């Protein structure tokens, strides 16, 4: 290398020693890159990463989120496991991945997370279910959904100095059928 008085072989050996045991990072990077462009083979590679509990939560969550772009029935069981993962980051990634499902299917799998212990997960579920009108659900479910939406609106309202908060609130209100309030937001 240019910064040491040693041969390239010395640098290569040092790098190999440093990165020993980290070969999985290459597979993860390749799967993520393929997932971002919906490349050939991305689905199975992402599904394998998402399903591996020994991997870091951030890797699994990213895999779930990207896997949703090309969701197949064969990976739906993996998503359901991800929604029950003990790590909220993995649950968050699984929720993001399931945004690709039609809203009527989304409600059925995400409803149990309306009361998730993690606020980040609950807020993501609120966005995923914003097209579901509480009035379309039985009274107990409607109350839970209304509470979730109130929590989401309060969270977005904390950042009203940001234009995207206004856009997010307007989108939610429009999804709920309140076009006049959406225009005001």
Model-derived features: where do they sit?
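Primarily the internal scaffold of c-type cytochrome electron-transfer domains
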Residues: 1-58, 65, 70, 117-118, ...
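Short, charged, low-hydrophobicity "junction" segments
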Residues: 15, 19, 99-106
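Amphipathic alpha-helical scaffolding segments comprising HEAT/armadillo-like alpha-solenoid repeats
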Residues: 39-51, 72-84, 102-114, 135-153, ...
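Structural detector for internal amphipathic alpha-helices that build alpha-solenoid repeat scaffolds
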Residues: 27-39, 58-72, 78-81, 89-103, ...
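Short coil turns that connect the paired helices of HEAT/ARM alpha-solenoid repeats
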Residues: 51-55, 83-89, 114-120, 157-161
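Long alpha-helical HEAT/HEAT-like repeat alpha-solenoid scaffolds in very large eukaryotic proteins
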Residues: 129-132, 142, 147-168
């Amino acid at each position: 290398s240019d910064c040491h008085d040693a041969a390239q072989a010395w640098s290569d050996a040092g790098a190999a020693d440093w990165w020993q045991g980290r070969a999985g990072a290459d597979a993860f990077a390749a799967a993520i890159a393929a997932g971002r462009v919906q490349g050939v083979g991305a689905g199975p590679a992402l599904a394998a990463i998402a399903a591996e509990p020994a991997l870091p939560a951030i890797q699994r969550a990213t895999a779930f989120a990207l896997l949703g772009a090309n969701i197949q029935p064969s990976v739906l069981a993996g998503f359901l496991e991800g929604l029950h993962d003990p790590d909220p980051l993995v649950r968050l990634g699984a929720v993001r991945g399931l945004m690709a499902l039609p809203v009527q299917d989304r409600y059925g799998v995400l409803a149990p997370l309306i009361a998730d212990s993690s606020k980040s997960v609950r807020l993501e579920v609120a966005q995923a279910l914003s097209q579901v009108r509480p009035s379309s659900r039985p009274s107990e479910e409607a109350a839970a959904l209304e509470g979730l939406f109130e929590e989401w609106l309060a969270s977005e309202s904390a950042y009203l100095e940001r234009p995207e908060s206004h856009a997010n609130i307007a989108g939610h209100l429009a999804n709920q059928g309140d076009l006049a309030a959406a225009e005001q937001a």
